[in-house]
Amino acid sequence: MIIKRDMRQDKRAAPKAPINENISAREVRLIGADGEQIGIVSIDEALRIAEEAKLDLVEISADAVPPVCRVMDYGKSIFEKKKQIAAAKKNQKQIQVKEIKFRPGTEEGDYQVKLRNLVRFLSDGDRAKVSLRFRGREMAHQELGMELLKRVEADLQEYGSVEQHPKMEGRQLIMVIAPKKKK
């Protein structure tokens, strides 16, 4: 026997607050539509006040004794909340880690091109991972790689700061540079 379930149902948002007749408490601490404290009233009185204002009675805090309820337009408050979440999500910037690879024998022209790319990454607000790969006998001259990474660090001083100092990982020397905070 196969039981089919509607998968969209499982992706429901947070449980909705009880409104109007769905509030189970006998008396509630009521907050008016304009935010003023009305006080502790019976649920029938609170529903009457909400109905007179042509608004909903929404349970805000069920944990309090008695529960806190507010007179408000429930549909409008949900819309405003969704709008705030969307605006916050839109304003978030995903920080990426961009990688530039060097070799111990990187020539001056290549060095300048790679440095320009690092400056661009840091200016865009991304973190930059500088990796220096050793091959074969180059492992015997790790100090050359350290000098190169120190030079990169010095050249990028005004654009970013070292987040992770150079360290060996297998045959690679890796350093991470974070962008300077914009004022």
From Swiss-Prot:
Record NCBIfam families: infC
One family name in Pfam for this protein: IF3_N
Single GO MF descriptor: ribosome binding
Coiled-coil spans in chain: none
Name listed for the protein in its UniProt record: Translation initiation factor IF-3
HAMAP family, sorted: IF_3
Organism: Pseudomonas fluorescens (strain ATCC BAA-477 / NRRL B-23932 / Pf-5)
Location within or outside the cell: Cytoplasm
Main location: cytoplasm
One GO BP annotation of this record: ribosome disassembly
Record's subunit section: Monomer.
Entry keywords, A to Z: Cytoplasm, Initiation factor, Protein biosynthesis
PANTHER family xrefs: TRANSLATION INITIATION FACTOR IF-3, TRANSLATION INITIATION FACTOR IF-3, MITOCHONDRIAL
InterPro entries on file: T_IF-3_C_sf, T_IF-3_N_sf, Translation_initiation_fac3_CS, Translation_initiation_fac_3, Translation_initiation_fac_3_C, Translation_initiation_fac_3_N
Keyword Disulfide bond: no
Family of the protein in this entry: Belongs to the IF-3 family.
Function: IF-3 binds to the 30S ribosomal subunit and shifts the equilibrium between 70S ribosomes and their 50S and 30S subunits in favor of the free subunits, thus enhancing the availability of 30S subunits on which protein synthesis initiation begins.
GO CC annotation: cytosol; membrane
PROSITE patterns reported in the protein's UniProt record: IF3
